[in-house]
Amino acid sequence: MVFKGDWRFYWNNDEKQETVLHPGDIISLPTNMFRGFENVGEVQGMCFSILGHDDAGGGVVWAPRVIEEAKGHGLILLEDGKLVDTTIGETIPEGKKPMPPLTPEQMATFDQYTPEQMATQVGRAGTYTPSTYKGFPNQTPDTLTYYDIIGPTDSEGHNFQVKPSDKNGDQFNVYGIESSGAGHTGKYSREAVEVMLVHRGEFDISCEHEGETLNTTLKDGDIISFPKGAARSISPLGEGFAYLVVGGDYPDAPKT
């Protein structure tokens, strides 16, 4: 999810397929696929990353090229994932071994995607179709619009526009909330964790949970994680856009 800068994402074993994303764009990267990314813009960049299934996938699997190039810089990756920097005098601890590069047979087990296949994994800011789902909290529909962005294709009431990256489900949904002026969701709660990532604009936030109340204003790049069951409201102060990440493949509807 690109917040700032222009980012090149590339994939497959040969790293030759690519696409460039700009601020507000989002990409859903499939599991079991080599990928990389780099800031190709002229300003300092920043991306948000969402990992599915409440874990990091058991660690990172590095392409052979990465391990070999690291050696050229004096860096040795160990089998346990730790990094040894020989340029500052570090040595491989006793009993530890360098991570061997993957064999051609192992490399052949990774999935390969064409640009056309990956196009279904990319969402472009400004191109989303408004959601027709009636369960979103919205007291100002004239100024507040929701979008179904990432989620299962068979989700009831939603028409997600970006394909999930995991064939077994990501265990999260991503929605967009856009304001053309001041607005208000009204107070609501969810039985799942909900994270709000502000792309642009200012949003007044109120959150009540276990006897405590938080009132704050989020601006460009700010994040808030709403606990399960917390009562919250979101009030844009003007034009803006934010992503809402909700846990679960099929989360329950918000309660108002």
Language-model segment annotations:
Residues 4, 32-34, 42, 182, ...:
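A generic structural motif
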Residues 34-121, 231-256:
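Double-stranded beta-helix
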Residues 1-23, 30-33, 189-220:
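A short beta-strand-loop-beta hairpin characteristic of the jelly-roll/cupin
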Residues 38-39, 179, 184-185, 197-198, ...:
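Long compositionally biased, domain-poor regions of proteins
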Residues 24, 30-32, 179-184, 220-221, ...:
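Tight coil/turn sites that cap or link beta-strands
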Residues 158, 173-191, 228-229:
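Conserved short histidine dyad/triad with adjacent acidic residue
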Residues 77-178:
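A short, N-terminal "cap"/entry segment at the start of jelly-roll beta-barrel domains
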